[in-house]
Amino acid sequence: WAWGLESDEPAAEQREQAALRIGRRFGVEVVAPPSPTIGQVRLRAPRLQPPAALAAFCTTETHDRAAHSYGKSYRDVVRAFRCEIPNPPDCVAYPRAEAEVTAILQWCSEANVVAVPYGGGSSVVGGVEPPGGDRPVVSIDLRELDRVLEIDETSRAARIQAGVLGPALEDQLRPHGFTLRHFPQSFEWSTLGGWIVTRSGGHYATNHTHIDDFVESVRMVTPKGVWESR
């Protein structure tokens, strides 16, 4: 329902103590509600089912759809904590290769389905939230596309997939003596693809403060084919 690992969630006693401190400070009664479970979430029925050719990496399960409904702004966290999810994606896809991304986008294009790319889900501006309207929505989660494909030590450049999280990216570069040296506040829970499309910056991204200072080329799969910036 918020940032971080489920295992790091404060215990009920810690939340209750925090509520007491806040209440005393502001002179109001503050109650720490229990964290909701996925069993409490009620979503509308999915408005589409993935075709058989895509079923191996697509799902309409409640947990997946709920988890891809919001980003991580305060408003998003509150709505999710209250199980207020009126507009979830109808399907979540986890492509494992470029060909599967192409297949998903072709299906979306032919079926008039909205495709929403999803990296780490750390957006605080509604970037991963499904748009309203009658069209079905597929959230395309890129977590499986998380590898450094190639490193050129001479030019100090690397080919990297969009779905890699910050720590995993650094872990793959470090054995070669390299670092991307881009550390936004969302570093642990955001992806390279998300950094690029939002022109990521932040308090911990110093000197060259935006990710586009480091980008030499982008290869992108679109509904009309593959596009490369150079």
Report each predicted region and the residues it spans.
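Noncatalytic alpha-helical scaffold of FAD-dependent oxidoreductases
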Residues: 1-230
